[in-house]
Amino acid sequence: MDAMASPGKDNYRMKSYKNKALNPQEMRRRREEEGIQLRKQKREEQLFKRRNVYLPRNDESMLESPIQDPDISSTVPIPEEEVVTTDMVQMIFSNNADQQLTATQKFRKLLSKEPNPPIDQVIQKPGVVQRFVKFLERNENCTLQFEAAWALTNIASGTFLHTKVVIETGAVPIFIKLLNSEHEDVQEQAVWALGNIAGDNAECRDFVLNCEILPPLLELLTNSNRLTTTRNAVWALSNLCRGKNPPPNFSKVSPCLNVLSRLLFSSDPDVLADVCWALSYLSDGPNDKIQAVIDSGVCRRLVELLMHNDYKVVSPALRAVGNIVTGDDIQTQVILNCSALPCLLHLLSSPKESIRKEACWTVSNITAGNRAQIQAVIDANIFPVLIEILQKAEFRTRKEAAWAITNATSGGTPEQIRYLVALGCIKPLCDLLTVMDSKIVQVALNGLENILRLGEQESKQNGIGINPYCALIEEAYGLDKIEFLQSHENQEIYQKAFDLIEHYFGVEEDDPSIVPQVDENQQQFIFQQQEAPMDGFQL
């Protein structure tokens, strides 16, 4: 877990929260790679590589019309005779400019073929890729430059080995020079190629950054009035900011924050989406990176974009907001001061499960904050929705809701914890004790322990000697489940279960040799028939 909180927050939690079993660093949780599906999926919202596909047209010169939008794909068939021929290779090595252009266009059309362009055939022809790179330097022939750049773009849209060929032929520094070309088509194709190269992996990304791409790229973004160029340039910039293993050198990419903050007010959803992705990557890290993002002045606009009508904008905006609230309490408060909670409440009812899940994750990092921040979540009427999610949602979303509620029981006041109990949080927490995810079983046990601890304090203060929350847990079949957890394979879980029973329930397990069976399909423990409640232990 790469969670990170400020030292002040850690100390405060250790002193103020009695729940020593819940690691204070874990309360503020960085996004877990295995837990968030959006980045793993090939999502529509963002592609790390894009091929400029070929659409047959009558005009020979591509400079007569804007470059095709990167999100448009084509399945237009290419005539079978268009394969790499000896004539094409001879023409590309000709000294005749017209033949060079004709051959390059033929190669470009082949490389634009969907869905499987013959990249390997092209790069295996000796000297052809190097010839394309040579054509990039033909400033007197912008049409040839453009066609060569397009061909190289599509080679770089392939595998790492394909991208590596483009890098090793020395194309990257030349593409960066072409960002200052007088011809917009050439500029746009150059930035597209650089985006594909940077999008391959961290090694390629860092190579492009070390070639000093950022100053001319930011100048292009500042000066261009062409929407397709802006789209491609922002997408390339987001690829330069992307990656965690390792992340890009922050000093290399942080100068883009001012430009991103301006582009965050674009009216184009594609531009907005990639700006938000870039900000989400930049804020995914330690608190000093989060602070740099905050200082760029983007928070209020990011929160506004949570209510955008296009999910491809909402998803990365939510990711960025969620990353910012993994910071310390002061950084979290910046987001709260932008009226984020009503937006998060809205997103908790989104028809998209992935949005609901990330909204729960974001709220869980807010409830890991101070008591005033927990109260703000209460005042926003978010907890009733969280408890409903805890009861009914998909398991991956329930997990995030469990963190949100347990974090609130860990740092909340007695009144705040009583509020959660009154909303009915005990039953769904008890239901989580039977799932196969050991971490979530621990989270649920910690939440119940915090509630029981409060009940013990209240019973002593009131002189009644009875913990009012023990009965609620028993009614929810929680005691039965805690007893069975004494046979859990995880040492921390069975020790916690033993301690809870010994301290709060004053009973011993009848037969410590009983080990529940596991139903792999249901991902939960199955208890003996006579011990199970009437409605079973369903997720």
From Swiss-Prot:
Biased segments, Basic and acidic residues type: 26-40
One Pfam family matching this protein: Arm
InterPro entries: ARM-like, ARM-type_fold, Arm_3, Armadillo, Importin-a_IBB, Importin-a_IBB_sf, Importin_alpha
Gene Ontology cellular-component annotations: cytosol; NLS-dependent protein nuclear import complex; nucleoplasm; nucleus
GO biological process: NLS-bearing protein import into nucleus; protein import into nucleus
Alphabetized SUPFAM superfamilies for the sequence: ARM repeat
Motif stretch (Nuclear localization signal): 45-54
Tissue specificity remark: Testis.
IBB domain location: 1-60
Protein localization: Cytoplasm
Record's comment describing the protein's domains: Consists of an N-terminal hydrophilic region, a hydrophobic central region composed of 10 repeats, and a short hydrophilic C-terminus. The N-terminal hydrophilic region contains the importin beta binding domain (IBB domain), which is sufficient for binding importin beta and essential for nuclear protein import.
Family: Belongs to the importin alpha family.
Official protein name in the record: Importin subunit alpha-6
Organism: Homo sapiens (Human)
Organism classification: Eukaryota, Metazoa, Chordata, Craniata, Vertebrata
Gene from which this protein is expressed: KPNA5
